[in-house]
């Protein structure tokens, strides 16, 4: 029977569980796991190497050392399986049971579990409502604690020192009970009545007023309730039995020379056992109290060290002064169980080697060295050799392969055919870092890689290595071929643009062959077809660049795939005609009838993919690459020093700039400008000079003048190699050429501030020593940045993956009507991202109407593809409401409609797509790229000169958005609001440009005026912020005296002005201007530090007059150094140091009573109580008394805090803010990421909410819960007609969000393992295994991708089983009832016997 049970037990498949529960182990449970008590500290006998009986490696407890053999050797072999040897007591079985059988130690005295004691907040402390220090004093035998006060005046859980205890004993005798050590805490915990406490606290909560007490009680209530629900008992936090880990998980290995290598755990266990045995002996001997106490304390310390060494006091060290690795250390950190063995495993059948170029490969191929292939495909080769009859056994096959017989190679060819291999390059930053290829066998020892996939791998051939993996099973091969093949990964998942794009030499070749040249050989010829043009080129009758006419045949591809011909005589060049021969039919010739730079080639491949599909694109990409390589060779473009032409104008520009700088310097010395202004202006002058030199140089390089056929002079694009390389996008940029042939310009110090002496030389002229020395700053900073930021970026990616890993596409449509509003993104007047790019591949949330009409252009829930976007653009739609993952209403995962297009495939996203991980990779991957690319411009300061005007680029109508303005004495408009924008509207009513104009800007035209291109419409001073009067008023000074201001004379004009001193010094009064006007009464304006006062005391001010100017700070350069940490700050939702102050309510601004160092801001709404806020005096406010503000408007400048935006402006505002800020950082680096990915992460950051009103739900006020849980609970409550809970969404940083996920397995494997597991155990948490990480850890298919269907089937099967069981139980109940009725009837019928 036992064997049968065993057999059944083995049959049970391990993955058939639905969730994992973690809890506290009760002593009985620990004993039930155990196979015997470990009584001795001995490990193995050093002579025989056999484990000692009852020791830490005892074979009787843990199982045999050799398979099916008992320790003394009486029973050997399989036939005795299951026998227990009567001599040595060992069960005859497999030795691997030594990995799973546990033992236990019966502790002579209870011991507190350090995790529940010291892991903050201390669970034991919270349970007993005592402080951690008090509990520690009891545990480590410094104080007594009252366990049972009896009829005395003492309180339960009161602490008594030794003297107090003796006094109490004298006074009360044995009426009370006080103890020390873990027994005392054990008794206290055991005496707790959890149910009664919970009920009492629930009643008490509503009546509590103090916030701190309420918080504390809520915390304790949550803890007690979790004990109530989980079935854990509080006293189980104190150990009375200690489990012992199976011996094979803490091995002891004999080294040669009689020494042993052992796991640290064995040392820790030995200490525990030694101290425990000593304590038992002392107790038996009834030793004096003080000795026993000391021994108990040592036992407590030994168990602490075993569970978590170093958590309390000094870590216990081994013989080599290194802290011992405890159980907690085994599971946490990069080398711990989770990250080392469960999430990352080494794989079989893999190899690695250096990579080289394979320019002749097709896109789906890679070159695999024969040696590697032979090794990797061994099992397949053995099988084939046996199947062919070339070898009789595996051994013979092995011999054949080792001898490398000729037939082995034939078999290898056959095995490899159609069997894809995976190539991976570390670091794998996104999913394109592992792709599948078909191997072709090559001689040599280096793997050959197709040049076009280098971009995806970020690989180059300067010694990079790659790993090869072999997918073994049919399913794996199928997935490799269908999903991972390089030919299936043409589009980048980050932005949906082709990632298989030619670069470098290929671009150079294509650019060279598609350029035109004036008066080239063969100009003006006519050809009947591109083939004829090619013949003319091959025979030397025409050159590549000759301008000719060619008859071009184009094919229009219809929807059904049929092609119609169209023939036109086109002006083109010979080279372009030749290029048209390699393109697939169906692409318009105009795509290549131009000089093909990198952007154009990318556009060409994109068009090809969208119109002709995958297969043609792959073929085209290969053909384009071969052609490019060929013509790059023919071009033979090389760079000589004479190619870097220095412009003649450079000398004059630099002299002019130096003169301007001298002038500024003189003004500074005569006190006209402050040091900061001088610095800013000098830097502006040099930035402008640099731009001018660069412009002159590029004009010089890019155009040359030649004679045409008629003997006239004509301009044409230059054939200078340096220019061609940069212009085509093959290598280098204008910024780099500027350093070669213009001037190096301004350099930055390592701290980011700009050195004001520029490097006027360039690399062709050479730098002198000082210039070279200044340059080294930037170069070194670049290298240092690289090293640091690679790690930072990797960590950011890890956090992103962790927070987003469980977001999977779950269903088709969640049915929401919500969405986000999309408008074109405008920065600095330019449209940086047109609407079409932002909405492409999104689903429309509500019908899109034609502007000004009710005509529906696109209905809701339609996916916008290229054609629809073009249609919307031609109808000049300027805003669209689209579905977004942020507003998706699925409880778990997101729906396909809210996500939209799968960027890497170009169609609607499929079910089971792991959009979270893709998003994390798309954001993280360029982060690493950026950090590796800081230093290419060698730290040259790339700071735009400060803007001081708005110059319009297009002709149209000027409109002011949310403007407040006054007219000054010259009848010009002066802006007096913070959020004014100028927009330029064209004749179709489309917004063409948008500019922010600052407070105090003066407009040259009026609202709704017509402006022409190039006109300057607004001016302001970029270096200072003016204070402008809005009405006629009399000015008087208040608190302006020598203590806080000083006079400064302007030597040019002889005027004196008052400048405010630094007010951050102690008790400085704040100077004010008082404005007195008839209709508005008094208004005061406070002046911050360093303000220059332009008004005079007692003057009559007109509207638009400038009363004072506040200087602006000088600017630092923006390197991505600001970039990566900035992105991390945004995703971590960190509060900035001095955040902008936002208005908490809408209303009128006023001032209240001041206190030390702070002013009191009062906002009075129309119909509610005034809101007050204290603001530090030194903060510069944007608002004046009497102004009206809207809720969420900026009152004091500074970086905005996302938490404030969420609280005051809502979810859509905060998501817009984060998306735009993150995008700005990436855009600065020229990286494109789709907004979707950032939204996915934001959705995860907004998962939690704070309960503001509990209603009839089980939540507590102030508790933090998952939004989805509240929604589910509220739906239930509404069904029952009860009051739902109300909540406020909270924004969590990605680290916090990952740690507070529902799944404790996922959180524990991320960070802070101890804390997460402690919390989960106390709450008796269940992990539903919803996310990807949890499933990887328990060793199942993940519920995404191809595993999605498996999991769905499993759930369906479980449901069916459950229903079947219910039906069965119902029918069983029916049967039972019928039976009882039948029996009763019989009883009634049987005649009674007494008759």
UniProtKB/Swiss-Prot annotation:
SMART domains: RPOLA_N (SM00663). Mg(2+) binds at residues 460, 462, 464. GO terms for molecular function: DNA binding; DNA-directed RNA polymerase activity; magnesium ion binding; zinc ion binding. Its cofactor is Mg(2+); Zn(2+). Pfam families: RNA_pol_Rpb1_1 (PF04997), RNA_pol_Rpb1_2 (PF00623), RNA_pol_Rpb1_3 (PF04983), RNA_pol_Rpb1_4 (PF05000), RNA_pol_Rpb1_5 (PF04998). GO terms for biological process: DNA-templated transcription. It is an enzyme of class 2 (transferase). Zn(2+) 2 binds at residues 814, 888, 895, 898. GO terms for cellular component: DNA-directed RNA polymerase complex. The keyword Magnesium applies. Keywords: DNA-directed RNA polymerase, Magnesium, Metal-binding, Nucleotidyltransferase, Transcription, Transferase, Zinc. The keyword Transcription applies. Its EC number is 2.7.7.6. It catalyses: RNA(n) + a ribonucleoside 5'-triphosphate = RNA(n+1) + diphosphate. Zn(2+) 1 binds at residues 70, 72, 85, 88. Binds 1 Mg(2+) ion per subunit. The RNAP catalytic core consists of 2 alpha, 1 beta, 1 beta' and 1 omega subunit. When a sigma factor is associated with the core the holoenzyme is formed, which can initiate transcription. Belongs to the RNA polymerase beta' chain family. DNA-dependent RNA polymerase catalyzes the transcription of DNA into RNA using the four ribonucleoside triphosphates as substrates. NCBIfam families: rpoC_TIGR. This is DNA-directed RNA polymerase subunit beta'. It comes from Pseudoalteromonas atlantica (strain T6c / ATCC BAA-1087). The lineage of its organism: Bacteria, Pseudomonadati, Pseudomonadota, Gammaproteobacteria, Alteromonadales. The gene is rpoC.
């Amino acid at each position: 029977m036992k064997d049968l049970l065993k057999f059944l037990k083995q049959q049970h498949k391990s993955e058939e569980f639905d969730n994992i529960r973690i809890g506290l182990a009760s002593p009985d449970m620990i004993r039930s796991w155990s196979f015997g008590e470990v009584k001795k500290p001995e490990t193995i006998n050093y002579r025989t190497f056999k484990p000692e009986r009852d020791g830490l490696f005892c074979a009787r407890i843990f199982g045999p050392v050799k398979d099916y053999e008992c320790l003394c050797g009486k029973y050997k072999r399989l036939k005795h399986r299951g026998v227990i040897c009567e001599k040595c007591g060992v069960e005859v079985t497999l030795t691997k049971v030594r990995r799973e059988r546990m033992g236990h130690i019966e502790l002579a005295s209870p011991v507190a579990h350090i995790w529940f004691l010291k892991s903050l907040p201390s669970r034991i402390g919270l349970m007993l409502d005592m402080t951690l220090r008090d509990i520690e004093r009891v545990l480590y035998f410094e104080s007594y604690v009252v366990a049972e006060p009896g009829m005395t005046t003492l309180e339960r859980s009161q602490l008594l020192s030794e003297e107090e205890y003796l006094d109490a004993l004298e006074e009360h005798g044995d009426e009370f009970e006080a103890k020390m050590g873990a027994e005392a805490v054990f008794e206290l915990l055991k005496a707790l009545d959890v149910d009664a406490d919970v009920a009492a606290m629930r009643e008490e909560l509503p009546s509590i007023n103090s916030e701190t007490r309420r918080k504390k009680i809520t915390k304790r209530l949550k803890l007690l309730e979790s004990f109530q629900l989980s079935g854990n008992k509080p006293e189980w936090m104190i150990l009375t039995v200690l489990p012992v880990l199976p011996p094979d998980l803490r091995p002891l290995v004999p080294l040669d020379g009689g020494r042993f290598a052992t796991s640290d755990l064995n040392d820790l266990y030995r200490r525990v056992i030694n101290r425990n045995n000593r304590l038992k002996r002392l107790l038996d001997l009834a030793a004096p109290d003080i000795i026993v106490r000391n021994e108990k304390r040592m036992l407590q310390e030994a168990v602490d060290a075993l569970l978590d060494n170093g958590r309390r006091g000094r870590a216990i060290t081994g013989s080599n002064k290194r802290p011992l690795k405890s159980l907690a250390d085994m599971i946490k950190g990069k080398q711990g169980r989770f990250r080392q063995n469960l999430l990352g495993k080494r794989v079989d059948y893999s190899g690695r080697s250096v990579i080289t170029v394979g320019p002749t490969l097709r896109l789906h191929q890679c070159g695999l060295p024969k040696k590697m292939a032979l090794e990797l495909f061994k099992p397949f080769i053995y099988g084939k050799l046996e199947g062919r009859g070339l070898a009789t056994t595996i051994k013979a096959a092995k011999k054949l392969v080792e001898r490398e017989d000729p037939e082995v190679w034939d078999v290898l060819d056959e095995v490899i055919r159609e069997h894809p291999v995976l190539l991976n390059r570390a670091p794998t930053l996104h999913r394109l870092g592992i792709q599948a290829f078909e191997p072709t066998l090559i001689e040599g020892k280096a793997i050959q890689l197709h040049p076009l996939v280098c971009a995806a791998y970020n690989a180059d051939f300067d010694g990079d290595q790659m790993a090869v993996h072999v997918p073994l099973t049919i399913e794996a091969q199928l997935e490799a071929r269908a999903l991972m093949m390089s030919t299936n990964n043409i589009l980048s998942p980050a932005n949906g643009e082709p990632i298989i794009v030619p670069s470098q030499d290929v671009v150079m070749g294509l650019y060279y062959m598609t350029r035109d040249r004036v008066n080239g050989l063969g100009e003006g010829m006519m050809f009947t077809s591109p083939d004829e043009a090619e013949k003319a080129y091959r025979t030397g009758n025409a050159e590549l660049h000759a301008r000719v006419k060619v008859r071009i045949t184009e094919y229009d591809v219809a929807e059904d795939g049929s092609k119609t011909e169209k023939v036109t005589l086109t002006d083109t060049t010979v080279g372009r005609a030749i290029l048209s021969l390699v393109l697939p039919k169906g692409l318009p010739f105009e795509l290549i009838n131009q000089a093909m730079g990198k952007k154009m080639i990318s556009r060409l491949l994109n068009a090809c993919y969208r119109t002709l599909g995958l297969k043609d694109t792959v073929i085209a990409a290969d053909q384009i690459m071969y052609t490019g390589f060929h013509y790059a060779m023919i071009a033979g473009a090389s760079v000589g020093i004479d190619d870097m032409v220095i412009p003649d104008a450079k000398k004059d520009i630099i002299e002019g700039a130096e003169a301007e700088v001298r002038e500024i310097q003189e003004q500074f010395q005569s006190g006209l400008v402050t040091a900061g202004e001088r610095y800013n202006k000098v830097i502006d002058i040099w930035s402008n000079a640099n731009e001018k030199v660069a412009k002159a140089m590029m004009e010089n390089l890019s155009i040359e003048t030649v004679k045409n056929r008629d003997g006239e002079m004509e301009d044409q694009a230059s054939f200078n190699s340096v220019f061609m390389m940069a212009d085509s996008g093959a290598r280098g940029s204008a910024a780099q050429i500027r350093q070669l042939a213009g001037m190096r310009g301004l350099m930055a110090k390592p701290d980011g501030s700009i050195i004001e002496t520029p490097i006027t030389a360039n690399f062709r002229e050479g730098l002198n020593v000082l210039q070279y020395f200044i340059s080294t700053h930037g170069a070194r900073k670049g290298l240092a940045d690289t090293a640091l930021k690679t790690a930072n970026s990797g960590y950011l990616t890890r956090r992103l993956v962790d927070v987003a890993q469980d977001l999977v596409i779950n269903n088709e449509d969640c049915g929401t009507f919500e969405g986000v509003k999309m408008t074109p993104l405008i920065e600095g007047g330019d449209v940086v991202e047109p609407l079409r790019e932002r909405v492409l591949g999104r689903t429309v949330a509500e019908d899109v109407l034609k502007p000004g009409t009710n005509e529906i252009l696109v209905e809701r829930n339609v996916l916008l593809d290229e054609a629809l976007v073009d249609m919307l653009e031609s109808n000049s739609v300027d805003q669209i409401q689209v579905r977004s993952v942020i507003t998706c209403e699925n409880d778990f995962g997101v729906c396909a409609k809210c996500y939209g297009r799968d960027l890497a495939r170009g169609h609607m996203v499929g079910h089971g797509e792991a959009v979270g991980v893709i998003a994390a990779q798309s954001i993280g991957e360029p982060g690493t790229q950026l950090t590796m690319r800081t230093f290419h411009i060698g730290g040259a300061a790339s700071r735009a000169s400060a803007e001081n005007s708005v110059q319009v680029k297009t002709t149209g109508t000027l409109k002011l958005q949310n403007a407040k303005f006054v007219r000054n004495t010259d009848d010009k408009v002066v802006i007096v609001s913070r959020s004014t924008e100028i927009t330029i509207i064209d004749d179709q009513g489309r917004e063409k440009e948008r500019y922010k104009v600052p407070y105090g800007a003066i407009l040259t035209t009026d609202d709704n005026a017509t402006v022409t291109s190039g006109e300057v419409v607004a001016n302001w001073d970029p270096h200072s912020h003016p204070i402008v009067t809005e009405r006629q008023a009399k000015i008087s000074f208040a608190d302006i005296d020598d203590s806080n201001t000083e006079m400064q004379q302007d030597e040019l004009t002889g005027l004196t002005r008052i400048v405010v001193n630094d007010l951050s010094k102690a008790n400085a009064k704040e100077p004010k201007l008082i404005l007195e006007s008839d209709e508005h009464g008094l208004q005061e304006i406070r002046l911050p530090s360093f303000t220059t006062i332009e008004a005079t005391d007692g003057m009559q001010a007109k509207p638009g007059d400038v009363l004072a100017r506040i200087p602006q700070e000088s600017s630092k350069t923006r390197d991505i150094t600001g970039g990566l940490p900035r992105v991390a700050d945004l995703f971590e939702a960190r509060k900035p140091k001095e955040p902008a102050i936002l208005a908490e309510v809408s209303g009128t601004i006023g001032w209240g009573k001041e206190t030390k160092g702070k002013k009191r801001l009062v906002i009075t709404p129309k119909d509610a109580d005034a809101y007050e806020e204290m603001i530090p005096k030194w903060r510069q406010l944007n608002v004046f008394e009497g102004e009206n503000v809207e809720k969420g408007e900026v009152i004091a400048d500074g970086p905005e805090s996302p938490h404030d935006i969420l609280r005051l402006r809502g979810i859509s505002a905060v998501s817009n803010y984060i998306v735009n800020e993150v995008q700005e950082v990436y855009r600065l680096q020229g990286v494109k990421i789709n907004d979707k990915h950032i939204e996915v992460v934001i959705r995860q950051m907004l998962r939690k909410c704070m309960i503001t009103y509990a209603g009839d739900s089980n939540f507590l006020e102030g508790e933090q819960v998952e939004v989805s849980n509240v929604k589910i609970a509220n739906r239930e409550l509404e069904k029952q007609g009860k009051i739902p809970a109300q909540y406020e969404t909270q924004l969590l940083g990605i680290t916090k969000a990952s740690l507070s996920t529902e799944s404790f397995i996922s959180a524990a494997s991320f960070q802070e393992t101890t804390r997460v597991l402690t919390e989960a155990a106390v709450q008796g948490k269940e992990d539903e295994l919803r996310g990807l990480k949890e499933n990887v850890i328990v060793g199942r298919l993940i519920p995404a991708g191809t595993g999605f269907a498996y999991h769905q089937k499993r759930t369906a099967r479980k449901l069916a089983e459950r229903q079947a069981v219910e039906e069965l139980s119902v029918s069983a109940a029916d049967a039972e009832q019928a039976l009882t009725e039948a029996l009763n009837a019989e009883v009634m019928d049987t005649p009674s016997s007494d008759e």
